[in-house]
Structure formats: structure tokens, C-alpha cells
């Protein structure tokens, strides 16, 4: 099902945060930001991630579980493994997603199904299992990574936009469900970022996207990571059920 690589001891910690999709540019930045803020992080991705790839010279600890989050039936055991090996999580960042694009009338059904499974079903099911630990502790944080595409139309991203809109609806309703137990649930909606997901768009498209932003550039990955770290903090204890946008003003 999955394999484990760890530099952390198997002790429960109230500041343990699980981050999915840490093999990507945004997920790695989120993990690094949390570690620098003093959290212990367990990353999940299909590709193994060495601690040095995430932490650099920071003072925190990073552990990794290699798993396919698209395997919905295996998520229950994955959650059990995380709790058994690393302790009860304080926070969860649902970052892993796939960005399949294309005009909807010509997309294969299998591509649509995979996108919905990875971007919607998987984070909902993982949240189901890991928030059980937060409920018993009566404290916790859930941050879902959405996208400006959830609110602003982009050509060729109908299915992707639907998946991100679903996560924002999930965020608002889950905040109502578990808020009385001291758990906040929020979403962060990045605009286009300078990561591997935009590297193949071509110069003309990249220029057009940047001109659309009020600041005339892409949003910075580190800025998104900082927003996630803020939402994990005690300073954000009264922020729940909302989506915070980091897009250099592209939706202004």
C-alpha cells in the first residue's frame, strides 16, 4: 500500500501536520514553511521525498509516507499508519491534486473520473479519518488548497474548476460540522504560480496570465505557504469556513 521514510521519532505531538502532495513545488513549500514555524510534518505523495528536499537547514522534522492517494480504499489504512507511526495529527493540509485540462466535450471519461477521485473524493475521505483524532483532542486545523479557478472561469479547466469549487463547498460545511469541537477548516486559493504546473504553458500564455494580475506577475509559492502556516497558527483561531486568495490580484 505504502512505504515509510522517516527522520522523526514515533511520538505523538500536538503540532504534527499532515501535508499531501509534498513532491510538488507548492506542497514542498508548504511543508518547509510549517517546519520553519516549528511544526513536525508528515508528507504524503506518490514519489518518495527525502527530508533534505523539504527542510533544508530548518529546525523542524519531516517524515514521509509514499502512497497513492487515488487509491480510495487504502486511505483508511494510510490514516491508521500515520497515527500509529507518528502520532495524532493537529493539522491536515489537503494539497495533492491533478491539473488535467482540456475542453470538456473532448475529455475522456476516465480522465474526468481520475480528476474527481484525486481532487475531491480523496481529500474528503482522508479528512474523514484524520479529523477523528482532532475531534478527540478538541483542537485542530484543516486547510484545503483550492484555486482561483473555482471562482473565475479559465478556458479548458471546466472539470478542474468544478473539483476546486467542490472543495470550497466542503470547507464551508465541514467548518460547521466540527467547529464546535475547536477545529477550524479553511481553504487557500492560489492563482497561477511559477511551479512545474505552469512551466509548460508557453511564453505567450505565461505573459497573458501575468498581465491579468493586478501586480503584473505570478503569485509567489512562498506567499501561499505563509498563508497556510498562518491558518495553522493560534492567531487564526477565529478564522474558519472561509477561502483566502493568494493570486497577485488576478481576480481583483
Residue ranges and their predicted role:
Residues 127, 163, 171:
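Active-site helix of classical SDR
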Residues 103-104, 108-116, 198, 209:
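Substrate-binding pocket helix/loop in short-chain dehydrogenase/reductase
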Residues 147:
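Residue(s) in the substrate-gating loop at a strand-loop-helix junction
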Residues 124, 217-246, 251:
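C-terminal substrate-recognition "lid" of short-chain dehydrogenase/reductases
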Residues 23-24:
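Conserved glycine-rich cofactor-binding loop
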Residues 132, 176-180, 237:
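Alpha-helical segment proximal to the catalytic Tyr-Lys
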Residues 105, 152-158, 180-181, 216, ...:
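Active-site loop immediately N-terminal to the catalytic Tyr-X3-Lys motif
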